[in-house]
Structures are given as structure tokens and as C-alpha cells.
Amino acid sequence: MKQETKCLHSGYVPKNGEPRQMPIYQSTTFKYDSSDAMGRLFDLEDSGYFYTRLQNPSNDMTAAKIADLEGGVAAMLTSSGQAANFFALFNICETGSHIVASSAIYGGTYNLLGVTMKKMGIDVTFVDQNLPEEELAKVFRPNTRAMFGETITNPTVSVLDIEKFARLAHSHGVPLIVDNTFATPVNCQPIKWGADIVTHSTTKYMDGHGVSVGGAIVD
């Protein structure tokens, strides 16, 4: 399917007798016939919807649409773009880890990496993304766990050489995480160029109307 078709139809395939358009499930909880059934869900022994903070059909369908647009396997929605970046990085890093990141990134993300994660014992080296590969390779350490950049930087609108960053990251055995907020998957799919994980602030162009705050992680 073309991207335009995916925007309209991906993520939701109605079965016989189901709504033609993707419904919005406005419920915090879901009903089951017994407390035993609920207990198995809360213990994560069975799969199913029981509490919207953990899972919701509307969220899952939207995440599936974003994953399809990005060419990923799956996606997860978050409360904001910064939450998406935090979860993507913190799932990989721990105290004592090191991150290599482009210095030409959104101010909130720069603060997340340079201040918030530093308080957690995670170090970051910010680099000029336009330096040649041999210069960038010098900043990697044995404890480097991830490389980070933005497809189109906010607000300087510099374009990241994703293939170059991917080569560097993979040659050092770490994943490349790319924030694709400004480009959106309509204009660029970083996974095609070597990125391993893609993040979004859906608040920006993906929302398109300035009425909601959200984020997404695509693997």
C-alpha cells in the first residue's frame, strides 16, 4: 500500500458486523465475567484489555498504523515525545552507560540527555553530526549503548545522514535511535536507511491540528 492508503486504512481491519471506521474506546477499564479472569490478566498470564494505562484497543490500532507507516514491526504510544525518547533510551541504558548523540537536537531532548539522564548516572557525548565518520568514531566507548539523532533537527532544520550514523552505531554494536518528528513517515522512514528504533512527538505534524500531546516508539 502507498503511504496515503496506510494513513487511512492501516492498523484496523473490521470483521463482519464491526464498525467500518476505527472506533475510539473511551473507557479506563474493561468488564470480565469473573475475578479469576481479571486476576489472570493482572498477573499477565492471559492477554487482553483490562486497564487503559497498560492497553487500549484505540491505542493499539493507532500504534499499528504508525508502525506500518514507518516500516517497523510494532509501535507503542506514550504520553509525549519526550516520554518516547526517554523510554527508548532507558530501556537500553542503565547507570554507567554512555550515549552518543547529535548536538543539533530539540532543546527538550538535549536537556533530557544532558541533565535528566545524567542524574541517573548515564553519560552523553554530544557531537557535530556533520563530522566525518573517522572523527565521530573516536567518541565511542566500551560502555556506549546507543546513538541518537533527529531526521530533521528542531529548530535548526539540519538533515541527519542516517546511513552514516547507522554505520557508526552498528560498527560499535549499538542501536541507532532516530527522532522522526519533523519529517514524519510520509516523507522519510529512517528504518529504511538503517535506524533501529524510531521515535515521534505526535504533538507536531503527525497530529496536524495542535489539539493533543503524545509520542510513539517504533521498533
Predicted ranges, named:
Residues 34-86, 108-116:
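Conserved N-terminal alpha-helix of the aminotransferase class I/II PLP-enzyme fold
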Residues 1-56, 64:
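N-terminal "arm"/small-domain region of PLP-dependent enzymes with the aminotransferase-like
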